[in-house]
From Swiss-Prot:
One MF term in the entry's GO annotations: flavin adenine dinucleotide binding
Residues with PTM N6-succinyllysine: K66, K81, K165, K240, K254, K279, K322
Biological function: Long-chain specific acyl-CoA dehydrogenase is one of the acyl-CoA dehydrogenases that catalyze the first step of mitochondrial fatty acid beta-oxidation, an aerobic process breaking down fatty acids into acetyl-CoA and allowing the production of energy from fats.
Residue numbers carrying N6-acetyllysine: K42, K66, K81, K92, K95, K254, K279, K318, K322, K358
Name used for this protein in its record: Long-chain specific acyl-CoA dehydrogenase, mitochondrial
Binding site for FAD: 170-179, 203-205, 317, 328, 385-389, 414-416
Lineage of the organism: Eukaryota, Metazoa, Chordata, Craniata, Vertebrata
Length: 430
């Protein structure tokens, strides 16, 4: 069993002994090591490639890959039927040190760098197992608490979330408000020092298993604009009036619990307010670039997985007396796919480097999300086609990857909204 890396100790996993995770101050790139980039690598999913990583990252990646191979892949089909992963998996991930990686140690996180967090994103994509909501929990929900929470909130939630004993979700989307966050109708009204929360949310990842949910709510309808009247609240499972409606049945991400949530006169103490009153929209705008970068990373990594899966298939599948890989049209398609994926990988890695040093702008994150998620769907379509009829069979990994890809251009802000944000930056007079 793994012992989680803490303050100078060693990480143990399956006999593998690794130093503590790299931090931005210690090691955030290859440091002069000779490393192949994706176009020159034997496989796009190889360990030890790409200059943004170091040998320390490689050791960590080996342990993460082993975790997904041993603890996730064997059970994922079962979780797809259940519509959720087991809580036991969350605690195993916590013990392995896969949660809260990029959250500071002083807050109760692991204290690793962004690249270490990205390794978990990538390895989950390479496993083709979309059920565990680790990335949303660790790299979307936890940063809100770490960045805007009070000392009391941080101490209460972050250590338990890092251990996998408290599962986090964030509730933005409503039946009538998706990409338009200013259209939120869920509201919280003051009642003495408390707040009374009413409304509903939908399409909430980790919603069914969640122990704490960050809820976006209107707190000032008289504000000069909707953006100036939104606040964030920490709502805990079991609070009176907080009801989880049902797990939603999706065409993809079948093992990922996605729920609708209802709030009927939920009484929240003043301590449930996250950050300052009416500053919620500002906090959302600050954190959305990381969410969009995460989606881009998952998208290009899934594309790398699909390419390798398809390359292996066409080299084995025979037609017209030879393997499909020897048909020129197939070779040309593989050449196109690898080129598009490698170009996108270079851009997304560049965005990771910018974000590690807090220099990733919203427009660039929007470009990465838009481009990589479109690529993922294009790659999925072509890879299914190269599999022929077998690509349409659920037992083939490419079929799962195909349906899982479709939501990527939708959540985190639709790609149409991404283009609006990119265009706004282009035409804006600075």
């Amino acid at each position: 069993m793994a012992t989680r890396l803490l303050r100078g100790s060693l990480r143990l996993w399956g006999g593998l002994c690794a130093p503590r995770l790299p931090t931005a101050s210690r090691c955030s790139h290859s440091g002069g090591e000779e490393r192949l980039e994706s176009p020159s690598a034997k496989k796009l999913t190889d360990i030890g490639i790409r200059r943004i990583f170091s040998s320390e990252h490689d050791i960590f990646r080996e342990s993460v890959r082993k975790f997904f191979q041993e603890e996730v892949i064997p059970h994922h089909a079962e979780w797809e039927k259940a519509g959720e992963v087991s809580r036991e998996l969350w605690e195993k991930a916590g013990k392995q040190g896969l949660l809260g990686i990029n959250i500071a140690e002083r807050h109760g996180g692991i204290g690793g760098d962004l690249y270490s967090a990205a390794i978990v994103w990538e390895e989950q994509a390479y496993s083709n197992c979309t059920g565990p909501g680790f990335s949303l929990h660790s790299d979307i929900v936890m940063p809100y608490i770490a960045n805007y929470g009070s000392e009391e909130q941080i101490k209460h939630f972050i250590p338990q979330m890092t251990a996998g004993k408290c599962i986090g979700a964030i509730a933005m989307t409503e039946p009538g408000a998706g990409s338009d966050l200013q259209g939120v109708r869920t509201n919280a009204k003051k009642d003495g020092s408390d707040w009374i929360l009413n409304g509903s949310k939908v399409f909430i990842t980790n919603g069914w298993l969640s122990d704490v949910v960050i809820v976006v709510a209107v707190t000032n309808r008289e504000a000069r604009s909707p953006a100036h009247g939104i606040s964030l609240f920490l709502v805990e499972n079991g609070m009176k009036g907080f009801v989880k409606g049902r797990k939603l049945h999706k065409i993809g991400l079948k093992a990922q619990d996605t729920a609708e949530l209802f709030f009927e006169d939920v009484r929240l103490p003043a301590s449930a307010l996250l950050g300052e009153e009416n500053k919620g929209f500002y906090y959302l705008m600050q954190e959305l670039p990381q969410e969009r970068l995460l989606i881009a990373e998952l998208a290009v990594s899934a594309s790398e997985f699909m390419f390798e899966e398809t390359r292996n298939y066409v080299k084995q599948r025979k037609a017209f007396g030879k393997t499909v890989a020897h048909i020129q049209t197939v070779q040309h398609k593989l050449a196109e796919l690898k080129t598009h994926i490698c170009v996108t990988r270079a851009f997304v890695d560049s965005c990771l480097q910018l974000h590690e040093t807090k220099r990733l702008e919203s427009a660039a994150a929007s470009m990465a999300k838009y481009w990589a998620s479109e690529l993922q769907n294009s790659v999925a379509y072509d890879c299914v086609q190269l599999h022929g009829g077998w690509g349409y069979m659920w037992e083939y990994p490419i079929a799962r990857a195909y349906v899982d890809a479709r939501v990527q251009p939708i959540y985190g802000g639709t790609n149409e909204i991404m283009k609006e944000l990119i265009a706004r930056e282009i035409v804006h007079d600075k």
